[in-house]
């Protein structure tokens, strides 16, 4: 049996659809909202429903053989996993954003405060790309509130449609990285479990269609 870690949340439905279209599963994982461990009736695949940032950890330690996770998570955490495929789902981007109309003023500000769920990505971008040292405040949600309430000057966050930013008087200043879901694999599992190659081939064919 191959164990696959899936992220709970926005990627679950798209990942389920991808597995179904690849004829790998017969169950609808996205409808099993309360179960944390799911097995396909055919008995060859087991799914672990975990938080997105925990997916690489389960794969790294071999609890899961494979996982689906956003590139944002892989950029933020340094885990020893093999990134095998860009699954072309869950597309969005990481952006530097702030109050509408203040872009030039805030980018020129000498001592910037940035709120984000991605402190490592933010630090790497400002230090290595812009050559700046900034104060970073780590938040776990509702990052858009930070500049509105004066906690930060700007934010670094995931943007899909940009609607949440617009509704809160914010706008994108810079696009940092394009993001999509990736298939990651435990290195030992890749060598030991022959079934993995078949799963990967099925997913790869579906992506290329």
From Swiss-Prot:
GO molecular function: ATP binding; ATP phosphoribosyltransferase activity
EC number, as in UniProt: 2.4.2.17
Main location (coarse class): cytoplasm
Keyword Transferase belongs to the record: yes
Compartments it resides in: Cytoplasm
Pathway stated in the Swiss-Prot or TrEMBL entry: Amino-acid biosynthesis; L-histidine biosynthesis; L-histidine from 5-phospho-alpha-D-ribose 1-diphosphate: step 1/9
Pfam families per record: HisG
Regions that span the bilayer: none
Biological-process GO terms, alphabetical: L-histidine biosynthetic process
Catalytic activity: 1-(5-phospho-beta-D-ribosyl)-ATP + diphosphate = 5-phospho-alpha-D-ribose 1-diphosphate + ATP
UniProt keyword terms in alphabetical order: Amino-acid biosynthesis, ATP-binding, Cytoplasm, Glycosyltransferase, Histidine biosynthesis, Nucleotide-binding, Transferase
Record bears the keyword Nucleotide-binding: yes
Database matches in InterPro entries: ATP_PRibTrfase_cat (IPR013820), ATP_PRibTrfase_CS (IPR018198), ATP_PRibTrfase_HisG (IPR001348), ATP_PRibTrfase_HisG_short (IPR024893)
GO cellular component: cytoplasm
Signal peptide extent: none
Function: Catalyzes the condensation of ATP and 5-phosphoribose 1-diphosphate to form N'-(5'-phosphoribosyl)-ATP (PR-ATP). Has a crucial role in the pathway because the rate of histidine biosynthesis seems to be controlled primarily by regulation of HisG enzymatic activity.
Protein family according to the UniProt entry: Belongs to the ATP phosphoribosyltransferase family. Short subfamily.
Domain text: Lacks the C-terminal regulatory region which is replaced by HisZ.
Subunit structure, as described in the record: Heteromultimer composed of HisG and HisZ subunits.
Record-linked NCBIfam families: hisG
Protein name from the UniProt record: ATP phosphoribosyltransferase
Source organism of the structure: Caldicellulosiruptor saccharolyticus (strain ATCC 43494 / DSM 8903 / Tp8T 6331)
Upper classification of the organism: Bacteria, Bacillati, Bacillota, Bacillota incertae sedis, Caldicellulosiruptorales
Gene designation: hisG
